[in-house]
Amino acid sequence: MDEQDGDLDFSFVLASSVHDMKNSLGMLLHTLESMLSENPPENEQQRKTFSVLGYEASRINSELVQLLSLYRLQHEALRVQTAEHFVLDTIEDQLDRNDVLFQAREIEVEVDCDPDLNWYYDSELIGGVVNNVMVNCARYCRSRMQVRASREQGTLCIAIADDGNGYPQSMLDAPNQKNAGVSFSEGSTNLGLLFAHQVLQLHRSGSQRGYLQLANQGPLGGGVLSLYLP
């Protein structure tokens, strides 16, 4: 083996491992969904157990998808596949994806979106961002979540609100910064915010690019994260 063959591209090995883990977690989530469908929780303790399993599996799977996407973006292997989509379809795909999680945590999700509302974007990437926000809201909300999509001054706005305690000030101050609200002591690196920011920046129209906004005191009293696409 020559020197070139002996060089180990650790980032490639790591990305391959992440891909395998993502697939395994997908199978785990499917198994959990089937188990819940066949054997619904019989008491509060079982419901809480399923809730924790559903949330943690969904969260890790979402973060693995984000890591893979960011790796591909860094290596210029991630391209935006823009096409016209019905926004409600994208939202409902993510709701179906997290149905087990919402059931286990007894979360009521309200959707406000015109069925005829359409826009040009990469449905896989934007769907991944919406999914991550939903999973995050499922952890911090009390019992309600709202997803609203509308046209606002020439942009598409997808706003996801919950009835939790809202976003911390560090995240509100710099939602688009790579290190916004990083807290290793609390296990929070805000990978989701970095992923969302990068994906939105890839969506552009002329000089306009996508962006996100965070706010508190939303329609349900808690935080609201708004995605804007040109």
Residue ranges and their predicted role:
Residues 167-180:
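Short conserved segment of the HATPase_c
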Residues 201-218:
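Glycine-rich ATP-binding loops of the HATPase_c
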Residues 75-80, 118-121:
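Conserved micro-motifs of the catalytic ATP-binding
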Residues 83, 108-117:
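Conserved catalytic submotifs in the C-terminal HATPase_c
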Residues 55-63:
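Short alpha-helical segment of the dimerization/phosphotransfer core of two-component systems
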Residues 32, 36-44:
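Short acidic helix/loop segment immediately C-terminal to the autophosphorylated histidine
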